[in-house]
Design a protein with these regions (language model features):
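Generic secondary-structure signature for well-ordered alpha-helical cores
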Residues: 8-13, 134, 190-195, 224, ...
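A short, local hydrophobic-aromatic micro-motif
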Residues: 109, 137-138, 217, 229, ...
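ATP-dependent carboxylate activation and anion-phosphoryl transfer catalytic cores
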Residues: 130-133, 249-281
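ATP-binding N-terminal substructure of ATP-dependent carboxylate-amine bond-forming enzymes
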Residues: 1-114, 118-120, 124, 131, ...
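Phosphate-binding site of ATP-dependent enzymes
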Residues: 177-258, 278-280
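Active-site nucleotide/adenylate-binding loops and adjacent lid/helix of ATP-dependent enzymes
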Residues: 1-5, 14, 70-77, 116-205, ...
Length: 281
C-alpha cells in the first residue's frame, strides 16, 4: 500500500489488487477501471502476528475456483502498463507467477522466472553460493520420503535450524536446541513442504543488504526486540529495530555488500534483490 500511495503521488493510476481474491465484476465492466482505481483497490488491514490460516483464506473466496488467480486478475494485469510484484510466499516468489506473466505478455517488475525459482529454493541457491565462494551456513537437505527423526544419525551438530526449502517469512522455521525438539521441528517444516533444509545455527547479529541493478545499498542491521527474526518480528510494527547504516567496521560492511552483489550476479537477480547475513559472535 505504501508503494501504491507513492506511485499515485507521482501521478500514476494505480490499482491495488489481491491476486488470489481478485475483483468480482463482469469482464465487460472492466473498461475504464483505472479511472475507478480508488473504488476498486483492496483495503489493506494490519498484518496479524501469526501466519494466516490458508484453509480459511481459501474458504473465504467467493468463486471457490482452484485457480491461483482470482476473478479478472489476468485481464486486469494485461490492461496495465506494468504490474508491480509485491507478493510473499511460494507462488508469488518462486517463478511460477513470473513464468505465467511471460506467457501472457504481462510486463512486471523484479526478476524473471528462472532467477526467482533459484532464489526461492534454498538448497539450490546454497549449491550456487558454494561454487562461487560465497559463505553460507553448513547444512543438508531432507525430503519427506527420506525423513530421519534421529538427529544423531545425521551429519549435524546442535543447535540447528530446520526450515522449509522453498518457504519464506520464517514460516515453518524452528531453532532446535536439543535432540528432543528435532522431531517436532520436522513435523512443523514438513507441514508446509515435502523438502526442507537443516542448517547449523549461527548465533550473532543479523543484517540485510539490498541490491539494485547490481549495486549494493547500505547495510541494515535488524535487531528483534525478543526472540529471532520470525514472522511476528518481521511484520508487526515495533517488533524489531532496524538501523541503517549498520554500526560495523567499514571492511565488514564492504564485504557484506560485495557478497550481496555476488549473490545477485550468481542467481541472475538483475533488477533488485535482498540478501540476509548473520555475523557470528
Amino acid at each position: 500500500s505504501m508503494v501504491a500511495s507513492a506511485l499515485k503521488e507521482n501521478g500514476h493510476r494505480v490499482i491495488l489488487l489481491d491476486v488470489f481474491m481478485g475483483y468480482s465484476d463482469k469482464e465487460e465492466n472492466l473498461d475504464g477501471i483505472f479511472d475507478r482505481a480508488d473504488e476498486i483497490s483492496v483495503k489493506v488491514d494490519d498484518i496479524p502476528e501469526v501466519a494466516p490460516d490458508l484453509a480459511a483464506v481459501k474458504a473465504s473466496r467467493k468463486d471457490q475456483s482452484p485457480c491461483f488467480f482470482g476473478p479478472n486478475v489476468i485481464r486486469m494485469c494485461q490492461m496495465a502498463d506494468i504490474v508491480l510484484m509485491a507478493l510473499h510466499g511460494e507462488n508469488g516468489e518462486n517463478g511460477k507467477l513470473q513464468a505465467a506473466f511471460d506467457l501472457l505478455g504481462v510486463k512486471y517488475t523484479g526478476s524473471d522466472y528462472l532467477s526467482s525459482a533459484i532464489a526461492m529454493n534454498k538448497g539450490m541457491a546454497k549449491q550456487l553460493f558454494a561454487s562461487a565462494g560465497i559463505p553460507a551456513p553448513r547444512g543438508i537437505a531432507m525430503k519427506k520420503e527420506n525423513r530421519e527423526d534421529d538427529v544423531t544419525k545425521l551429519p549435524l551438530t546442535l543447535p540447528c535450524v530446520v526450515k522449509p526449502c522453498c518457504g519464506g517469512s520464517s514460516i515453518g522455521v524452528t531453532i532446535v536446541r536439543d535432540a528432543a525438539e528435532f522431531k517436532k521441528a520436522l513435523d512443523e517444516a514438513f507441514h508446509w513442504e515435502d523438502e526442507l533444509v537443516i542448517e547449523e545455527y549461527v548465533k550473532g547479529r543479523e543484517f540485510s543488504v539490498g541490491v539494485i541493478e547490481g549495486k549494493a545499498l547500505p547495510v541494515i542491521e535488524i535487531a528483534p526486540i525478543q526472540g529471532f527474526y520470525d514472522y511476528k518480528n518481521k511484520y508487526k510494527a515495533g517488533s524489531a529495530v532496524e538501523t541503517c547504516p549498520a554500526d560495523l567496521p567499514e571492511e565488514v560492511s564492504a564485504q557484506m555488500r560485495k557478497y550481496a552483489e555476488q549473490v545477485a550476479e550468481v542467481i541472475g537477480l538483475d533488477t533488485y534483490s535482498r540478501s540476509d547475513f548473520l555475523l557470528d559472535e
